[in-house]
Amino acid sequence: IEKLDPGLFISLSELNNLRRKAVELLEQKIKENPSHKQMDETDYSTELKLPQNKSTKTHNSKEAYLIDDYKKLNQLLLEKKTINKDYKIIYELPSAVNIVEKELFDLLNQNPEVTLYFNSILMQNDLEASINFVKKLTDFSEREILCDNTGLAFELKKSGCRIILGPNCNIHNSWNLLEYKESLEPSGVIPSLELDLSSIEKLSIPENVELWYPKKIRTMLMQSRQCLV
């Protein structure tokens, strides 16, 4: 690593080749040194146990609509009351929630059944503004919040809000789902969008945790882990 030039770009395929070569060299050294003691896996055992897998095929499905337009939100709320249909309404807020107009805030405040969606938040001032925005709502501790930011999830969970962890929390296996359950106690989760349906069906879902999955979702460039690499 010390011999690499500063600013050198290495493609993902080349990184994989280097990894494979490193594994081959390590395996060769182990064969050449019979006295080498392999690690005893029992020394690193854990008391964590996965919950029994609950088949996602037997669950009752519910519909949810994700929108980010004030007029559509108002229309959807009126339609829901008119037809008396049971579905969730999720409203995606901008990262800079301080620009939210009073008219929209009042509508969200008057309809506590609307789930608020906070996308990934990178700046500290945006994070603090999001926390303050939620706390200004009437009976905010009873709100359901969908968020892709674990810091925001942690702060709002302390206030009593029901938390749904979004796809950017990168829930990709049963173990990190269990860790999130222990640390943040979410009411529901959306697995990583990198997982296909067959992988999601194999997840061990903890008790009192709803499994959400988007049928359609807007994805952005440079968002996945592969793009970031």
Region locations from a protein language model:
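Non-catalytic helical/linker scaffolds that mediate oligomerization, partner binding
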Residues: 1-229
